[in-house]
Amino acid sequence: MAVIALDTPQGGARVHLHPAAHPIAALMLGHGAGGGVAARDLTAATKVAVDAGVSVALVEQPYRVMGRRSPPRAPVLDAAWTSIVEQLAAGELAGLPLIVGGRSAGARVACRTAAATGAIAVLCLAFPLVSPSGVSRQEELDDASVSVLVVQGASDRFGIPEPDPERSRSVVVVRGDHGLKSDPIAVGDAIAAWLMVVLAQIG
């Protein structure tokens, strides 16, 4: 594992790069609003992806590198993320088909920017379908026009998205809440099965 510092227009970002031995694709994952890249579901995703031949980049947004817990507005997050994707795609992850994703707020960023980053698929861990004030974020999820996997806790207080075969969106519900800490094995199994399908399509 290597830690890479990157500059973005929004400040310095940090990337934890877990390279596969013989990578056939890359997976970039963002953290939740107040959390970090050591979240249990991100750890599970990293392990199964690397085992499947996918190099993983866990991205710390600039505001977290600065020590802040509260995220900036969506356009700021999206701009920083897009800058990081572009730099990695031209550098450490050059030539690899790109899968993007994240947990909670990181999943929202990945969905909103999927088209701009040229992602072939999106992995959403604990996608917050409804905001704390009750506002639906369905449109953000629908913005991702590629294959999408949502892994959601059965008791997630922010709701559970519906699968949509027409949009190539599948949803796997596992034991637990928004933290997805209760059953990391089930989380990993769901991701591994989905990755097999995604990777077969680019093979």
Would you name each region that the model predicts?
Residues V37, G153, R157-E162:
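Conserved alpha/beta-hydrolase "acid-adjacent" motif
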Residues G118-S131:
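A conserved short beta-strand
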Residues G102-A110:
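Gly/Ala-rich beta-loop-alpha elbow adjacent to hydrolase catalytic centers
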Residues G176-D189:
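Catalytic histidine-centered segment of alpha/beta-hydrolase-like enzymes
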Residues D143-S145, V150-Q152:
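Short beta-strand/loop motif that positions the catalytic acidic residue
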Residues I4-P97, V109, V173:
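Serine-hydrolase catalytic machinery in alpha/beta-hydrolase-like enzymes
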Residues V109-T113, S133:
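Hydrolases whose catalytic domains are alpha/beta-hydrolase-1, hotdog thioesterase
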Residues P97-G102, L125:
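Short beta-strand immediately N-terminal to the catalytic nucleophile in serine-hydrolase-like folds
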